[in-house]
């Protein structure tokens, strides 16, 4: 079933084609939800860009499009007469009876009117990607939950999604860590969990300091890397133990956040690195510069005005991150079974890596490794800052461990809940308190991040994110709880066969907000901005609360009761589904 916006878009395109058959290209209605209620339900702005090629005034073009729309019975059955506004905007208002019918249809539809795409294609989402032998910190939070949310939306739209965790499990750091552990904690290289991950992180710091300060240690560490790369069984066993230990600790965080990932670390691509060099050589892109193999970028210059290089093989013959990323791109777009067969590859990393990926993407494009019509995208995000506007740190100045941050969020949510229960003189079981605090705490952390435009930095504040008012997870969760309370008070939210009738302005406002859901999901799929979904859910919660506060529901007249209960149910279903796509669980009681 086509959604309202899809039906309108198709009707507008057909009308534009009939009105201007000579303009066979560029006929895009530019359909969007109306910015204000007085403009109707949708606005079509496609007349404006046609003015120049057609050499006509935009209002004249809009008039011709409207004439064709009015001659289409399917359109007149869906919409009232269009209005032309401003320089040539076409304002469209859906007929009230069609809006009511759409609400009825969504009540019986688990997808709530969001159609699966007709052109589903495999997508790779690369996110989280912590480093072995290091604990996950607050910087991993954004990549992990943004990537998870985008994967959920793409999956919901019908795309097969491969969620990849490109962990840092290879490189010089293992040479220095293994060398150091052989001397100070050899048991860690022979026995699983001989030291915990926190100790391993401390050992890593010690090894890094020795590597920076001691040339002999540097040399021994590099020899260890060579042994590891050469398949030395002792080195490989030590490496495997370190990876397994980190992997188990990472999984505890992923389980807690309800994150699904398939690990495919940097080491996976080692066998494919020589082929990257061969492929670039065959494409005549390689240039030797100071003994290193490089590809010089087009249109990107350094301060000296010369093209910047992407180094793919160092002068000592070693490979680097760029080589691994190029091998990963080749594999991800490569045809199965030798590759993933993806048509869209999305990298979710901090904005500091934007230049790196821009360079790697350009090299892959010029080498011919991105299939025609495929999409390769970097999804950058800003820093998590403290309330002082600086990078979030502990009081001791260290990076905040992710598990500590999650623990504190849940503890604060529990403190708030116990305080509220005391004020309300409510008695709840310990199981209830722990469940609600855990759900609210993690929801607050996720939503506070996802509700920000990911491109910008944001200031982390437990007080703000746990507030029951404002654009917060608790506010949205409370809207769901409010509706669940209607059912507990005797409202039958399960009935779907009632003839829906709406008369109050608050009802129509809620209807119109509910019917925007499909367009918002399509927008998030295309633009990869989860905050658009957050903004919509917040606005929906506000519109619902105004409706619920101003219009009687359980005490409504019998002829209005079923319709108002239907609105409550669809609101709850939309909030649950929308929050679920953000990776946030809901509650029936708080």
Curated annotation (Swiss-Prot):
Residue numbers covered by motif 'HIGH' region: 130-140
GO biological process: arginyl-tRNA aminoacylation
Principal subcellular localisation of the protein: cytoplasm
Disulfides per UniProt: none
Gene Ontology terms for molecular function: arginine-tRNA ligase activity; ATP binding
Domain of life: Bacteria
Enzyme class: ligase
EC numbers, comma separated: 6.1.1.19
Localization of this protein: Cytoplasm
Gene3D superfamilies in the cross-refs: Arginyl tRNA synthetase N-terminal domain (3.30.1360.70), HUPs (3.40.50.620), Isoleucyl-tRNA Synthetase, Domain 1 (1.10.730.10)
Entry keyword set: Aminoacyl-tRNA synthetase, ATP-binding, Cytoplasm, Ligase, Nucleotide-binding, Protein biosynthesis
NCBIfam families: argS (TIGR00456)
Similarity annotation: Belongs to the class-I aminoacyl-tRNA synthetase family.
Entry-linked HAMAP family: Arg_tRNA_synth (MF_00123)
Record-given protein name: Arginine--tRNA ligase
Annotated organism of origin: Synechococcus sp. (strain CC9605)
Taxonomic lineage: Bacteria, Bacillati, Cyanobacteriota, Cyanophyceae, Synechococcales
Gene name, Swiss-Prot/TrEMBL: argS
């Amino acid at each position: 079933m086509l959604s309202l916006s899809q039906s309108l878009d198709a009707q507008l395109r057909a009308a534009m084609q009939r009105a201007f058959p000579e303009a066979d290209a560029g006929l895009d209605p530019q359909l969007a939800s109306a910015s204000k209620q007085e403009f109707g339900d949708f606005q079509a702005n496609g007349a404006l860009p046609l003015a120049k090629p057609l050499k006509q005034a935009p209002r004249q073009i809009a008039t011709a499009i409207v004439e064709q729309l009015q001659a289409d019975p399917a359109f007149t059955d869906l919409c009232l007469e269009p209005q032309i506004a401003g320089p040539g905007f076409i304002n469209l208002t859906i007929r009230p009876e069609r809006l009511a019918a759409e609400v009825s249809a969504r009540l019986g539809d688990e997808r709530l009117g969001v159609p699966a795409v007709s052109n589903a294609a495999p997508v790779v989402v690369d996110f989280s990607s912590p480093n072995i032998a290091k604990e996950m910190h607050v910087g991993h939070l954004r990549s992990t939950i943004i990537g998870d949310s985008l994967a959920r939306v793409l999956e919901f739209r019908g795309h097969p999604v491969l969620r990849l965790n490109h962990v840092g499990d290879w490189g010089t750091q293992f040479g220095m860590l293994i060398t150091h552990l052989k001397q100070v904690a050899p048991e860690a290289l022979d026995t699983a969990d001989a030291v915990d991950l926190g100790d391993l992180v401390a050992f890593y710091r010690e090894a890094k300091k020795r590597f920076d300060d001691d040339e002999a240690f540097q040399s021994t560490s590099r020899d260890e890397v060579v042994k590891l790369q050469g398949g030395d069984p002792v080195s490989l066993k030590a490496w495997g133990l370190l990876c397994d230990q980190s992997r188990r600790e990472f999984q505890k965080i992923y389980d807690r956040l309800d994150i699904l990932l398939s690990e495919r670390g940097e080491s996976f691509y080692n066998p494919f690195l020589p082929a990257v060099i061969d492929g670039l050589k065959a494409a005549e892109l390689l240039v030797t510069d100071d003994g290193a193999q490089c590809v010089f970028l087009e249109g990107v210059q350094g301060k000296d005005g010369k093209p910047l290089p992407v180094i793919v093989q160092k002068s000592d013959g070693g490979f680097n991150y760029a080589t691994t990323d190029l091998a990963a791109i080749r594999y991800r777009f490569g045809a199965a079974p030798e590759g993933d067969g993806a048509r869209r590859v999305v990298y979710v990393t901090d904005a500091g890596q934007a230049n790196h990926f821009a360079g790697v993407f350009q090299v892959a494009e010029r080498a011919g490794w991105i299939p025609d019509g495929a999409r390769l995208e970097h999804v950058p995000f800003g820093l998590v800052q403290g309330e002082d506007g600086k990078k979030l740190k502990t009081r001791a100045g260290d990076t905040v461990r992710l598990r500590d941050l999650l623990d504190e969020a849940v503890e604060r949510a529990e403190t708030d809940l116990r305080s509220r229960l005391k004020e309300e003189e409510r008695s709840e079981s310990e199981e209830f308190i722990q469940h609600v605090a855990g759900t609210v705490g993690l929801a607050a952390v996720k939503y506070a991040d996802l509700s920000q435009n990911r491109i910008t930095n944001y200031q982390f504040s437990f007080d703000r994110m746990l507030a029951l008012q404002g654009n917060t997870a608790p506010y949205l969760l409370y809207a769901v709880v409010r509706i669940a309370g209607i059912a507990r008070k005797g409202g039958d939210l399960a009935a779907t066969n009632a003839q829906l009738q709406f008369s109050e302005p608050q009802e129509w406002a809620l209807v119109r907000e509910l019917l925007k859901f499909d367009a918002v999901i399509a927008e998030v799929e295309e633009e990869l901005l989860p905050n658009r979904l957050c903004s919509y859910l917040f606005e929906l919660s506000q519109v619902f609360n105004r409706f619920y506060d101003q219009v009687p529901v359980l005490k409504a007249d019998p002829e209005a009761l079923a319709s108002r209960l239907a609105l409550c149910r669809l609101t709850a279903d939309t909030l649950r589904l929308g929050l679920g796509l953000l990776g946030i669980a809901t509650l029936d009681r708080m």
